[in-house]
């Protein structure tokens, strides 16, 4: 994949918000197709792609499409995408935080029971899914943010916003303080023609405080 001409990472000590080049990431599973369009990345998902481990359903899916890059300790990752194409059951787009096949988090939007939901699946051996309906977010440009931190550095704070709203808290969850990667995610468990347009992937300074919203840009 060709790059979009922007830099990837910098040391946390001097980090400012910076875009990540699409070419800096590696796919957990190659999608059905990708193309660059004016600096945005359009991803076509493969039918049946998903991430889930065991809980309730009994099955394990480890074949979603995550574009992963370095995620430094004490840093945040932000992924922005257009939600207009999420129209079929279980269509998903957002961010994947990955420390291994049994320790990962996916956070973003998913269409469930005909309604768009904002949520997160936190997996430590088995998956734990939390979600809330956001029907008014349909068709908007969405940013999902995940910030590493906590007293021991072993937690992640997930927030989300639309292009016209402030940050909304989604989840605070345990997450390894060790090596991990993160980046855009798309899954299409039920169809083979989902395309999602990602407009930005960025690294930013970590949240200063759990109860203080990060900057909007």
Regions found by a protein language model. Give the residues of each.
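Extracellular glycan-recognition regions
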Residues: 2-217
């Amino acid at each position: 994949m060709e790059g979009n001409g922007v830099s990837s990472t910098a040391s946390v000590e001097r980090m400012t918000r910076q875009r990540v080049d699409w070419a800096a990431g590696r796919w957990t599973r190659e999608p059905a197709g990708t193309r660059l369009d004016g600096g945005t990345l359009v991803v076509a998902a493969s039918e049946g792609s998903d991430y889930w481990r065991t809980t309730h359903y009994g099955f394990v899916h480890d074949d979603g499409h995550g574009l992963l890059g370095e995620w430094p300790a004490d840093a945040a990752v932000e992924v922005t995408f257009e939600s207009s194409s999420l129209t079929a059951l279980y269509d998903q787009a957002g961010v994947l935080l990955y420390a291994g096949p049994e320790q990962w988090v996916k956070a973003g939007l998913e269409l469930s029971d005909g309604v768009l939901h904002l949520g997160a699946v936190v997996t430590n051996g088995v998956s734990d899914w939390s979600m809330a309906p956001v029907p008014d977010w349909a068709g908007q440009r969405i940013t999902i943010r995940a910030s590493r931190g906590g007293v021991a550095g072993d937690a992640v704070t997930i927030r989300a916003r639309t292009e016209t709203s402030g940050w909304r808290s989604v989840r605070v969850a345990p997450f390894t303080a060790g090596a991990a990667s993160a980046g855009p995610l798309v899954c299409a468990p039920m169809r083979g023609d989902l395309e999602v347009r990602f407009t930005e992937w960025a690294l930013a300074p970590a949240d200063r405080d759990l109860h203080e919203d990060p900057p909007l840009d």
